[in-house]
Curated annotation (Swiss-Prot):
One of its GO terms (biological process) is translation. The lineage of its organism: Bacteria, Pseudomonadati, Pseudomonadota, Alphaproteobacteria, Acetobacterales. This is Small ribosomal subunit protein uS13. Keywords: Ribonucleoprotein, Ribosomal protein, RNA-binding, rRNA-binding, tRNA-binding. It comes from Granulibacter bethesdensis (strain ATCC BAA-1260 / CGDNIH1). GO terms for molecular function: rRNA binding; structural constituent of ribosome; tRNA binding. Part of the 30S ribosomal subunit. Forms a loose heterodimer with protein S19. Forms two bridges to the 50S subunit in the 70S ribosome. PANTHER family: 30S RIBOSOMAL PROTEIN S13/40S RIBOSOMAL PROTEIN S18, SMALL RIBOSOMAL SUBUNIT PROTEIN US13M.
Length: 125
């Protein structure tokens, strides 16, 4: 397995597919990296030379924020919103949807498992 940006990428897959295993690199960025370094689409990771792997590694380190740095940046952005006390920060703090989705029904992923409410107690006369 080739190791790029601290991630072991699979060797039997195509380069553009394998690069997606790195957090912060999606389909468009992976394709852009391959075209920028003139790596053919059908080339697999185990067919790359050490020089090509080194060029990919250097390009990603130089041009992209990936893995820990990107996760830290996203977490800091969310923390900043929460510290500001703005609407989005309050929604993050309460664990509710941030982008305007309805919450009367749905939003179970964000709110967690539904808690059953005990039915009304019957009053005996």
């Amino acid at each position: 397995m080739a190791r790029i940006a601290g991630v072991n990428i699979p060797t039997n897959k195509r380069v553009a597919i394998s690069l997606r295993y790195i957090y912060g690199i999606g389909p468009a960025q992976a394709q852009k990296i391959c075209t920028e370094l003139s790596i053919p689409d059908e080339r697999r990771v185990n067919q790359l030379s050490d020089d090509e792997i080194l060029r990919i590694r250097e390009l990603i380190d130089r041009e992209y924020r990936v893995e820990g740095d990107l996760r830290r940046e996203v977490a800091m952005n969310i923390k900043r919103l929460m510290d500001l006390g703005c609407y989005r920060g309050l929604r993050h703090r309460r664990g509710l949807p941030v982008r305007g989705q309805r919450t009367h029904t749905n939003a179970r992923t964000r709110k967690g498992k539904a808690v059953a409410i005990a039915g009304k107690k019957k009053v005996t006369r």
